[in-house]
Amino acid sequence: MANIVVKRLERTPIDEIPVEIVERKGIGHPDSICDGIAESVSVALCKMYKEKMGVVLHHNTDQVELVGGYAYPELGGGCMVSPIYILLSGRATMEVLDKETGKIIKLPVNTTAVNAARDYLKKALRNMDLEKDVVVDCRIGQGSVDLVEVFDRKRTEIPHANDTSFGVGHAPLSTTEKIVLETEKLLNSDALKAEIPAVGEDIKVMGLREGKKITLTIAMAAVDKYVNSCADYVKVKELAKAKVEENAKKYLDGHELEVCINTADDDEDCIFLTVTGTSAEMGDDGSVGRGNRANGLITPFRPMSMEATSGKNPINHIGKIYNILSNIIAEDVAKIEGVRECQIRILSQIGKPVTEPKILDIEMIPENGFELEELSPKAKEVAQKWLDNISEVTERIVSGNVTTF
């Protein structure tokens, strides 16, 4: 059995502390654009490697940079005058020696990466003209010999950790966390875009809970071709606010809610108007890992890892595997009857099997009437089950069924 430690979480439950702050950067935020591209490139490379070689080869595509363009948004429709520049970098296996034939097999890494990036942009940013508004530059290089060796060792057996690092997770989400997450999902949903097409994808939701009152401060880009006047713009905000308030009722659990959208607006002279739906068109730059953590949120009142999850290889990169695994374990432990709140930390040692962390730390707050001693064996069983089936985590990632930002 792995080194699994269970102890009491010595803190007030998150929903009972007097103040809580939670943030989510939406899919059109420049940092989230980079996260989304990095992960899409990694998933595409995984599929290409499996198709051509039967296995996922070494790669890390977590170095995506976005340099903002320049635009002239106008009521009724403006234009881009300088495109957004996106740099794909990182490392990937581009050549493989076929031991049977002695020949070098060249793999279409850069082509796969560029196509994946463009496909993601097409899906994420509905109003962007990919032929004119964005330049995608691929500079992915061959992987480090040492890291490839660690990655390839005993490929048919358990992968070995590429680094000494850690992952963290928590569950269940607090009321504030749920509302922040679901608000961004709502505003960027297909259904809402069909009803209010002027709502762009660059959305940031900042949630503040003070006692039983939650305030959402939302930055929401508007798409200029759907907004013909300042009155139209104000109407878009009013419609979006009403949708947010209605949706939040499902999660409020007795809390009061205040929704504020684009608080910097002067509704005559200064409004959040864009051509493409993202502030990346106006010099707002982005990078992988500067935004949401693996659970899709930024939670300063919870433990967090500073490691970027998107774009890292899903086989043995601890910054990816353990952050995602921590959240999965936390979610399952939180389902155990009697567990009110759970935090997970998993630490690796470089070169050791990913199924054998140096420590897997579980902290729990029991519900009233339950003791830690009776919950501990159940929590350990959940954690061990996931360590024994860690390949399932990899499969979820490769299939694109895991959120990394």
Curated annotation (Swiss-Prot):
UniProt pathway annotation: Amino-acid biosynthesis; S-adenosyl-L-methionine biosynthesis; S-adenosyl-L-methionine from L-methionine: step 1/1
GO molecular function, one term: methionine adenosyltransferase activity
Keywords: ATP-binding, Magnesium, Nucleotide-binding, One-carbon metabolism, Transferase
Cofactor names: Mg(2+)
GO terms for biological process, alphabetical: one-carbon metabolic process; S-adenosylmethionine biosynthetic process
Role noted for this protein: Catalyzes the formation of S-adenosylmethionine from methionine and ATP.
Protein name per the record: S-adenosylmethionine synthase
Origin organism lineage: Archaea, Methanobacteriati, Methanobacteriota, Methanomada group, Methanococci
Gene (name only): mat
